């Protein structure tokens, strides 16, 4: 069985900025909805999953925001032209019978990670569809990540498997967290180690593996004294950044006593012919 889960906020943002302005007869913008559904249909055609669902962020602060007030603090509010399309998109997904997950205190990425973990322990394949690289840490033998972008209305995709990821980055997918812990992530306002950029961070992860291994033998590493000094002074920031960048994989998606595996499996057996997808309930 194959589950496909879409990173709702990420995909709709890519669609909004990648598709020319469109509107309904009453003037309501629709380009983001159109672009999202086009990506959804393409992924359904290419991946042919037995089940599909979508994760969304909520407006309320998550546990990361509450712990670190600088987390994503630089983000601008969602453009009004996009905000007015969100209810329409969710109504459309509901009409198609596609299950939506929005969990208080957690991000959409954490829902993606939890779905991937469910698939792994259930022996299913999982395809995560996203416009961000945060989810690349989830790539495994059972989980692939399809990175999507829309350019001038045309959708481009890159499918990451353990082999293709390692060929591009030179280390294991799980070490994406270590990379972000060192170099930071300006889009999420994750600081990383001050003075350590992408090139140096990539070299460190490729040579020494993980943040823990780097700091456990920092004095003996074959690195420049300046880099060692930055790492020494920035250890607390690296540890905090590692925590912020790590996707949670045990989000409580269902009330206590209910089993997500059963929900996904039973939903996958119910075919919505009008939408041409198999749904989650």
Where are these regions (language model features)?
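Conserved nucleotide-binding/hydrolysis micro-motifs of P-loop NTPases
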Residues: 10-11, 59-62, 133-135, 152
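Low-complexity, acidic/Ser/Thr- and charged residue-rich accessory regions of DNA metabolism proteins
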Residues: 2, 230-234, 243-281
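Non-catalytic, usually N-terminal nucleic-acid engagement modules in DNA/RNA processing proteins
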Residues: 1-53, 57, 64
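Metal-dependent nucleotidyl/phosphoryl-transfer cores and adjacent nucleic-acid-binding surfaces
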Residues: 6-11, 17, 45-48, 54, ...
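Short acidic, glycine/serine/threonine-rich loops at helix termini
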Residues: 15-18, 64-69, 138-143, 158
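Extended two-metal-dependent nuclease catalytic cores across DNA- and RNA-processing enzymes
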Residues: 23, 73-255
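Residues that cap or flank secondary-structure elements
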Residues: 31, 81, 260-262
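A short, surface-exposed helix-loop junction/capping segment
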Residues: 66-73, 262
